């Protein structure tokens, strides 16, 4: 998995943007980053323009590609040959150059102009992640991938991945009744669940044996993947722009079951 992305100006080694996907304790420290930049300065002279190559420096596994004097670096914690990682880094490179080629040519030195690109990085990486690790052979890999992922990465990314998966799995439904039936069927692929409602504007989903937070003790609501999955599934099924969904009970917090409440207004 990608841990961090660095976008660096070649020659000056100026860091234009650093984007981390992990919780703070897993981020690369200053000394390691300095060593990484030094290694890159020697490596890029041998790098074919547009190609993606990898190397290891100390404990870091690094993917690197360069184009138009901009270096794109991905730090990974597993197989650097992963197709998902290479495609993500390539897409980040292409989108960055597409959006900022004019600004770079006429750059005033203001790094803050690149800050808004973080949202595109998230969209690129986690859309690909969902395709490769969750949507493929669904639901075979859901539980293992999510439980491994949630220990190291920020919860907002789990919700994003869940939503992308829900959107990919859903099909348009003609009625609220058919939605209830389909979402119950979909969730039953990896969890016992109960779907109920008092009217067509609200939906309650109870999961008494939640596989996402099983064995976890936390003061926080821990099922962000399911929260995102349900949100994406409902929005796609009913062609809604957005809905309000919230986990109101969680086994990780000591509740008897996990509960999600969706407001479709």
Give residue ranges: language-model regions.
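Short beta-strand
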Residues: 54-56, 65, 195-198, 248-251
């Amino acid at each position: 998995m990608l841990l961090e992305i660095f976008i660096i100006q070649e020659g000056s080694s100026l860091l234009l943007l650093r984007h981390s996907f992990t919780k703070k304790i897993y981020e690369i420290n200053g000394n390691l980053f300095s060593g990484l930049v030094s290694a890159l300065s020697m490596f890029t002279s041998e790098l074919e323009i547009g190609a993606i190559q990898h190397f290891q420096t100390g404990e870091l596994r690094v993917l690197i590609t360069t184009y138009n004097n901009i270096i794109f670096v991905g730090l990974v914690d597993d197989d650097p040959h992963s197709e998902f990682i290479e495609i993500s880094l390539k897409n980040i490179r292409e989108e960055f150059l597409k959006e900022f080629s004019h600004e770079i040519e006429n750059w005033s030195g203001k790094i803050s102009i690149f800050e808004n690109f973080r949202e595109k990085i998230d969209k690129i990486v986690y859309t690909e992640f969902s395709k490769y690790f969750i949507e493929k052979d669904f639901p075979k890999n859901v539980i293992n991938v999510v439980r491994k992922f949630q220990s190291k990465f920020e919860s907002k990314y789990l919700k994003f991945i869940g939503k992308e998966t829900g959107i990919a799995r859903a099909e348009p439904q003609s009625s609220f009744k058919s939605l209830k039936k389909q979402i119950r069927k979909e969730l039953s692929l990896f969890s016992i669940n109960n779907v109920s409602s008092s009217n067509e504007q609200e939906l309650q989903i109870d999961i008494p044996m939640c596989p996402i937070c099983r064995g976890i003790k936390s003061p926080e609501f821990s099922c962000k993947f399911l929260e995102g999955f349900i949100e994406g599934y409902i929005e796609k099924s009913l062609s809604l722009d957005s809905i309000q969904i919230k986990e109101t009970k969680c086994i990780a917090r000591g509740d008897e079951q996990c509960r999600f409440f969706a407001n479709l207004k």
